Every structure is written in C-alpha cells, then in structure tokens.
Amino acid sequence: MDPLIAAASVVAAALAVGLGAIGPGIGQGNAAGQAVEGIARQPEAEGKIRGTLLLSLAFMEALTIYGLVVSLVLLFANPFA
C-alpha cells in the first residue's frame, strides 16, 4: 500500500469518528436537557417524554455508529489500497 494512501486513510478514519461523534453528542445533550425540563414542567407526562427521548437518542447514536463503521472500513478493508 502506498504510504500516502495509508496516511490519508488514517486521517480520514480519525475525522469520521471525531466529526461523527460531535453532532450527535451535542444533539443528545440538548435532547436530554429538554426532556428533563419537560418532565419538570409536566411530571405526569414522564413516561411519554422518556419513551420519545430514548427513541431519539437511539437514532442519534446510530449516526456515531455509522462514523465508526466508515472508519473501520477505511482502516481494515480499505477500498483505495
């Protein structure tokens, strides 16, 4: 494998994980904060809010997992090598 392609693959893998985790991390923090605020305002709606929150967090976490999969492909099954 060309050293330039190997180095670019490692940098791209790091960016895929790093940038792929920033957005969902911020989104999860905002969603959790709003859920806590909503439960504090309407405690009787806790079950509905919690269920929606968990589903939303799962979808946001999927984006991070996609970034991890892309980085693993670039590191171990590099299509450019």
UniProtKB/Swiss-Prot annotation:
It is found in: Cellular thylakoid membrane. Pfam families: ATP-synt_C. SUPFAM superfamilies: F1F0 ATP synthase subunit C. One of its GO terms (molecular function) is proton-transporting ATP synthase activity, rotational mechanism. It comes from the Bacteria. Keywords: ATP synthesis, CF(0), Hydrogen ion transport, Ion transport, Lipid-binding, Membrane, Thylakoid, Transmembrane, Transmembrane helix, Transport. The keyword Protein biosynthesis does not apply. Its main location: membrane. F-type ATPases have 2 components, F(1) - the catalytic core - and F(0) - the membrane proton channel. F(1) has five subunits: alpha(3), beta(3), gamma(1), delta(1), epsilon(1). F(0) has four main subunits: a(1), b(1), b'(1) and c(10-14). The alpha and beta chains form an alternating ring which encloses part of the gamma chain. F(1) is attached to F(0) by a central stalk formed by the gamma and epsilon chains, while a peripheral stalk is formed by the delta, b and b' chains. Belongs to the ATPase C chain family. This is ATP synthase subunit c.
